[in-house]
Amino acid sequence: MSVMASLQDRTDGTFAGDEWGEKDTRFLYGALNALSLLRLLDLVDTELAVKHIQACINFDGGFGTSPGAESHSGQIFTCVAALAILGRLDLVNKDKLGGWLSERQVPNGGLNGRPEKLEDVCYSWWVLSPLAVIGRLHWIDKEALIKFILKCQDTEHGGLADRPEDMVDVFHTYFGIAGLSLLGYEGVLEVDPVYSLPKTVIDRVIGKRSWT
């Protein structure tokens, strides 16, 4: 874990993905996720990490990969989840962000990652997770999204694709099922929206959280 902690830049709070230094909020979230589960957040400067996340907030309430980068659902997940881990959800404009995220739903019920892009099953997680954390999950049409996700199934061999009729893969299968969990779909184990792990596991490891 000391290696992971060493990847934080102590001048601006960012985290690199490796020794060669590429930085963005994905690496920040990944580090905070792992360190918090091991109760080792004291190895990094969490206040500086929060300041960096604040610098990534955009006028539309969303977050980008770095300060000034456009809002994207995947990066919003990493930033909101990181703030949840650090107990700083007070920094999120929940109504503004909830509005931007709910606008990601397109007419066929699916969700896209940013304006004018195609829908994709994986955004059933990247969009729904922050909506769940900020208490705005009811701002989308849940039934329409469930229908879209189920249409992306390979009913013969199993699995989920990014869109109906496309090839299934593990990535989209996982995030599609995780999205169904957040939607309360019957028979799917409850997933924690911050850690993307079974809620029973998170409750056992670090206790019940305020966002659940």
Residue ranges of model-derived segments:
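Core helices of alpha-solenoid repeat scaffolds
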Residues: M1, D9-D12, T46-V50, K94, ...
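Hydrophobic, ordered structural segments
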Residues: M1-T14, G21-E47
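Register-specific detector for alpha-helical tandem repeat solenoids, activating on a conserved position
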Residues: S2, Y29-L32, K51-Q54, F77-V80, ...
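Glycine- and aromatic-rich loop/turn segments at beta-sheet edges
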Residues: M4-G21, I53-G74, G98-C122, I149-M167, ...
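Residues within HEAT/ARM-like alpha-solenoid scaffolds
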Residues: E22-R26, V44, E70, G74, ...
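Tandem alpha-helical RNA-recognition repeat domains
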Residues: K23, S36-R39, S71, A84, ...
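Alpha-solenoid helical repeat scaffolds
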Residues: R26, G30-N33, G74-A81, W126, ...
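Terminal, non-catalytic domain-edge segments
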Residues: A82, G87-P107, E119-T212
